[in-house]
Amino acid sequence: MACRIAIDGPAGSGKTTVARLVAQRLGISYLDTGAMYRIVGLHLSRKGANVKSSSLKDYLKDLRIEYTDGNFYVNGTPVGEEIRTPEAGMYASLYAAHPDVREFLTRIQKEICKERNIVAEGRDIGTVVIPDAEVKIFLVASPEVRAKRRYFELIAKGYKVQYEDVLREIIERDQNDSKRDIAPLSKAVDAVEIDTSDLSIEEVVDMIIKLVRERCWEKF
């Protein structure tokens, strides 16, 4: 049996960094589902798709997302840093509420996680994508802490942003993600919640590794 680790939480809670490090420590696959929503968000925005449209299937039929060796490819082309911009994040949150987008990506994610040792992170991994995951984690942190992390990350990448704008976007994304009708951001009943506000990345990773070894001891 595979050991599947689901890590969920709001924007800026540390999911991506933590999940990647956990996967590296365990020597298993890592799936960034947030990147997949950013890919789709940018694709739909460039196509001029109206998020209020009853169907977005026609806009998605020519989009092929492949996952190979931890990397994403869109119609055969490697995905770059263009999906890491604040704009891409807002489009991801905007279009993620549409049922066609959820169905399109959930199907791909379920297939990727099927019978594989993997760390998958996002907002509905433990509740929708792999609800029977062997280990479920829900990371949280205050909006201010998450905004500060995101602000410094963007500054380091050369983006000119204001902390107040980043904080506002974090709060807006929280509202969009938690209030959407389909697969809203929520903690799975059996998930272990970890508040990362006052913890280092290493401390969070160590806590998750310990839990994984307790539940999947025969593999790690």
PLM segments and residue spans:
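Residue-level signal for inorganic ion chemistry
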Residues: 34, 76, 105, 119, ...
